[in-house]
């Protein structure tokens, strides 16, 4: 017990010392060249952050929703031995809800990439 406690104490102490050194060491000598952004040897003219299209975010969110649908539907076949009708009801409910959401998004024009 004492050996385990000693190993935990030593490893915690070494980790803390290394974290403190890694935090304070770069702050001792800040170099302006290292702090400036690098764009292929040219001085940066504008902001490095370009705005994204709202269409891109909408398609990304739709992708995440359908990815979540797959994650919810994959374990359902293993639940058939408990109650097959309940499993089918859950699967149809998930699919119908996502289909209704997709149709709504389609009718609102959210899937059109070009305006």
Swiss-Prot record:
Source superkingdom: Eukaryota
Subcellular location: Mitochondrion membrane
InterPro entries: NADH_UbQ/plastoQ_OxRdtase_su3 (IPR000440), NDAH_ubi_oxred_su3_sf (IPR038430)
A GO term, aspect molecular function: NADH dehydrogenase (ubiquinone) activity
EC numbers on record: 7.1.1.2
Bilayer topology annotation: Multi-pass membrane protein
Cellular component GO terms, alphabetical: mitochondrial membrane; NADH dehydrogenase complex
Main localization (coarse): mitochondrion
Catalytic activity: a ubiquinone + NADH + 5 H(+)(in) = a ubiquinol + NAD(+) + 4 H(+)(out)
Gene3D superfamilies to which the protein is assigned, alphabetical: NADH:ubiquinone/plastoquinone oxidoreductase, chain 3 (1.20.58.1610)
Tagged with keyword Transmembrane: yes
Functional note: Core subunit of the mitochondrial membrane respiratory chain NADH dehydrogenase (Complex I) that is believed to belong to the minimal assembly required for catalysis. Complex I functions in the transfer of electrons from NADH to the respiratory chain. The immediate electron acceptor for the enzyme is believed to be ubiquinone.
Family to which the UniProt record says this protein belongs: Belongs to the complex I subunit 3 family.
UniProt name for this protein: NADH-ubiquinone oxidoreductase chain 3
């Amino acid at each position: 017990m004492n050996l385990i406690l000693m190993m935990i104490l030593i490893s915690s102490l070494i980790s803390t010392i290394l974290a403190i050194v890694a935090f304070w060491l770069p702050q001792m000598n800040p170099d302006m060249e290292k702090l400036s952004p690098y764009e292929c040897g040219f001085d940066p003219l504008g902001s490095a952050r370009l705005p994204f299209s709202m269409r891109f975010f909408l398609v990304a969110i739709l992708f995440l929703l359908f990815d979540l649908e797959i994650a919810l539907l994959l374990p359902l076949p293993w639940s058939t031995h408990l109650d097959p009708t309940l499993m089918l009801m859950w699967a149809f409910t998930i699919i119908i809800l996502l289909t209704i959401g997709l149709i709504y998004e389609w009718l609102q024009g959210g899937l059109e990439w070009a305006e």
